[in-house]
Amino acid sequence: MRDFKTYLSVAPVLSTLSLGFFAGFLIEINRFFPDALTFPFFSF
């Protein structure tokens, strides 16, 4: 039962960290390329 509680407590921590990292990544991209629907280095 203790291992099951440990397993259930790992998923929220990992999802919070991964979503926080992804949100920070998007914020930094929008800081360098504001309002970019297509990135400048992908346009030909």
From Swiss-Prot:
Q: Which UniProt keywords apply?
A: Membrane, Photosynthesis, Photosystem I, Plastid, Transmembrane, Transmembrane helix
User: What SUPFAM superfamilies does its record include?
Assistant: Subunit IX of photosystem I reaction centre, PsaJ
Entry's InterPro entries? Answer: PSI_PsaJ (IPR002615), PSI_PsaJ_sf (IPR036062)
Per the record, membrane topology reads:
Single-pass membrane protein
Among Pfam families, the record links this protein to:
PSI_PsaJ (PF01701)
What Gene3D superfamilies has UniProt attached to this entry? Single helix bin
Q: Which GO terms describe its cellular component?
A: photosystem I; plastid membrane; thylakoid membrane
Alphabetical GO biological process terms = photosynthesis
Where, per UniProt, does this protein localize?
Plastid membrane
Transmembrane ranges, per UniProt, are 7-27
Among its keywords, does the record have rRNA processing? no
Q: What does this protein do?
A: May help in the organization of the PsaE and PsaF subunits.
| Family note | Belongs to the PsaJ family.
The identity of this protein, by name, is: Photosystem I reaction center subunit IX
- According to its UniProt entry, this protein's organism is Cuscuta obtusiflora (Peruvian dodder)
Q: Which gene encodes it?
A: psaJ
